[in-house]
Amino acid sequence: MTLIAKPSAGAAQPLQDSYQRFLQLGSRRAPQTLYVHEQGYRSSTINTDAQGMRYSHRAGKRFSVAECTGAGRINLLVGGSTALGVGASCDEHTVASKLSLLTGETWLSLAGCGLNATQELLLFLTHQHRFGQLGHVVVLSGLNTLAQEALVEILAATHDPQHSQAHLAFLNRFNEGVQDTAPARRASLWQQLRHAVAPRQAPQWPTLDALSPADKRLARAADSIGRSLRQWERLLADDHTSLTFILQPLLPWCRETLPAGEQSMLAGLAKQPTNFDRLLGDSYDRQLHSAFFRRIRSQAEPVPCYDMNCMLSSSPVFAEDLFVDRLHFNDQGNNALAKVITAKLGLAQEKHAQRRVPPVRQG
């Protein structure tokens, strides 16, 4: 499942070639984690450490999950590709780096493309031993968990071999919508012969019209997010760490009026929707969004939860081009996110300084 949209003419800020090369490297299966980004990746746009985690910057130094010794108290920005900073022109312009600049403290990116709420928690458990004193943990997330609810239904829909192959192809099209920046390789003679004699088949995609109603999937996703947040709360209860959940922004949930660059970007996406667009396409209704957040907040109690889709409009630059696709941001957008988060954390820390930790609910 891809989280990247194909750059289109007139987009607010097309995703850089480095992101496309980075994602075309794919993801490796590793024990206990579903996705692992390329380790030690180097480019002018995105760089990762020995664990595949992106670097953030503070005061001229870079820090990461694998390289945080001597950073003092650290803070974590947890989530998927938005928290990772896909769309930023360089590591210095991710949300984590902007939070470091605004707060004067080190913020690390504990994020990976495609991770759902449970996988985010598992990623923390995998690396928890690397962290010293934790100040704040901000989970900027929600949409991957929702998208995977549709994906689960697709995979469970049929056991017919032909349809199963289509479903497998759906999963394996990780790079759909990502332009290939590498030069095309000349096909071997055997490949040319096989292509010549093979029957012509149109690309198969699983049908999405048999999915359960969107409100049902949103409810299940909200319950999953709420359970995971209560587990986070229990894990961090003895560490005097502030935990906050922020529902990540989705363009249709954020805006009623689009700036020109984002209008052009959406026109391009309409011609070539990504897997992620297919999985979330029936969830863009604002009433569904409101019910989704309310249920997350109810299920996550007492973890403080906020909705960036509502808060982002408080930014002075909200009317400008911020999105590079429906869920990723350019540099100005990441800076706006960081400023809103900083302001909201100042309120949340005082209000939720003393929290009781309830037992994790079952079901």
What role is predicted for each listed range?
Residues 53-113, 117, 121-138, 334:
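Serine-esterase "nucleophile elbow" of acetyl-processing enzymes
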